[in-house]
Regions:
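Active-site-proximal, substrate-binding regions of enzyme catalytic domains
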Residues: 2-210, 217-259
Length: 259
């Protein structure tokens, strides 16, 4: 039965690890953009992993395009999050300071809060400078471009894209993954489908095990039961096996930290 219905069987973690030296890792744009959400020490580890597996990494052209379009969007969003956190923390401090002379608040607790405030203010300031530096100088963007040079897949022609979008209308109407969860989007409605078609084309041309690394856990990528992600959407695997005849375990970005 397994041979006839491979789409319903999941690859174990041990089997996945055994394939690391012979597979191709295909990165989604969201994973690349997560680099701009990480602390600097984590970014260095991420770059080390990418450099180690550089020859095995590919990025769909459409995913790379979306990555570039959204770098500044992500950085500005992170800066706004810091500002909002600062405001919330300052409001808390102001409320506490108005009551710190009450007898039930010990001097020790008050001193600890002062130390905490100083450290958090320092963290906010350092992270703000770090993100602003990325926004202006683009250091991580340049480093990633260097690491992934030659790793981006070939783009579809405008004619091919029109055909994919035409297929997308039918697929989305029938909830055929991936991408139908984005059917209501005004922009990049067929982005997931275009990425998927790039992956299928690459898999058909290359005799490699494919590991697609993404943090997209919508139901048009991931099978869910009782609120838990239990594996890849079987329809995706069925389509992949039909085109390729090989396993493609789709994992979120935690697969990177398991390398």
């Amino acid at each position: 039965m397994r041979k006839q219905f491979p789409q319903y069987y999941r690859v174990s973690q041990s089997d996945l690890l055994k394939r690391f030296d012979e597979c191709v890792f295909i990165f989604d744009s969201c994973v690349l953009l997560d680099i701009f959400r990480m602390k600097e020490e984590l970014v260095d580890k991420m770059f080390n992993v990418i450099e180690h597996y550089k020859d095995q990494i590919r990025v769909p052209y459409h995913a790379a395009s979306e990555y570039y379009k959204n770098i500044n969007v992500v950085l500005k969003f992170q800066l706004n999050k810091i500002r909002e956190s600062q405001k919330s923390f300052e409001a808390f401090i102001k409320t506490f300071q108005a009551q710190r002379n009450y007898p039930y608040i010990s001097p020790e607790a008050s001193d600890l809060l002062d130390k905490l405030k100083n450290q958090i203010d320092k963290d906010f300031s350092e992270q703000t400078l770090y993100l602003e530096k990325q926004l202006v100088q683009g250091l991580h963007q340049n480093k990633l471009a260097q690491l992934l040079d030659g790793c981006v897949l070939e783009a579809f022609s405008s004619t091919e894209l029109m055909e994919i979008e035409k297929q997308g209308e039918t697929r989305y109407a029938n909830h055929i993954p991936p991408g139908w969860k984005d059917a209501s989007k005004d922009e990049n409605r067929y982005g997931d489908l275009i990425n998927w078609m790039e992956i299928l084309r690459y898999a058909k041309q290359n005799a490699k095990t494919i590991i697609f690394i993404s943090n997209d856990v919508k139901e048009d990528w991931v099978q869910k039961e009782m609120g838990k992600n239990i594996g890849v959407q079987p329809l995706l695997l069925e389509e992949f096996y039909e085109k390729k005849g090989n396993h493609t375990p789709i994992r979120d970005k935690i697969a990177i930290s398991c390398i």
